[in-house]
Amino acid sequence: VFGRNRVGVRFAPLFTTTTEDRVYLGLVESNPHETYIRAAEMLNDLGIAYISIAEADWDNSPDLPETFRRDLRKTFEGAIIYAGRYTVEKALTVNSKGYGDLYAFGKPFIANPDLPYRILKGLSFNQVHNHTLYGGGEAGYIDYPFST
């Protein structure tokens, strides 16, 4: 129906420590770095458009190891998208090293309906109210203020 250049794959390589141990939903991988880099090689050979990396986003979660970001960029020629606890500063740092192409701001977008404008103008962000996320009501979704 559509070409490979319109297909992307999302990974959630939830490294639990910077020594790259991984435990997720009862699964344990002996070498998550090698596993995901090999998968990226295969996807690169197929010519897909992008890989999206969903990083762990809980408050004390570790960052992806820089060696993983570096090796993913060396391995995969398409676009790389990162998401999970991104700030403007973190996105700029990762981008300055050439590791990624696009950066997602999920929760900040919920709390800041004008997020692109705030980023452009260097304005502060509204704080996310975690207790209202995914609650089924309008509180926390349509009541965050726009910047003035």
Question: Which stretches of residues belong to each language-model region?
Answer:
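Flavin-dependent oxidoreductase catalytic cores
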Residues: 1-148
